[in-house]
């Protein structure tokens, strides 16, 4: 299936909490289809030194949330970016709204370098 517009949120979500659920809900307001990209255990170990829940456990919880339409793995890269997840969403949609929350802003979003001139990718922070 191909979509006009999808929202994408990415993160470790380890453990998932009410702030994440609010983040997902706000992201869903930008489109009719919400994709949640979950970082791997390896990514979490590099960022935090360890992980609490496996990718499979986090995905199982998140995929059962009413507002979530799809769950994907965020491919690891050298920058710790979500560029691979954006690429996956571009395969199924005309437009991707990449929604950033938590510790990300315009000054520390590596995905901007690659996609800021791509008319099919929009960025939201909040």
Describe the residue ranges of each PLM region.
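Nucleotidyltransferase catalytic core that binds NTPs
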Residues: 1-126
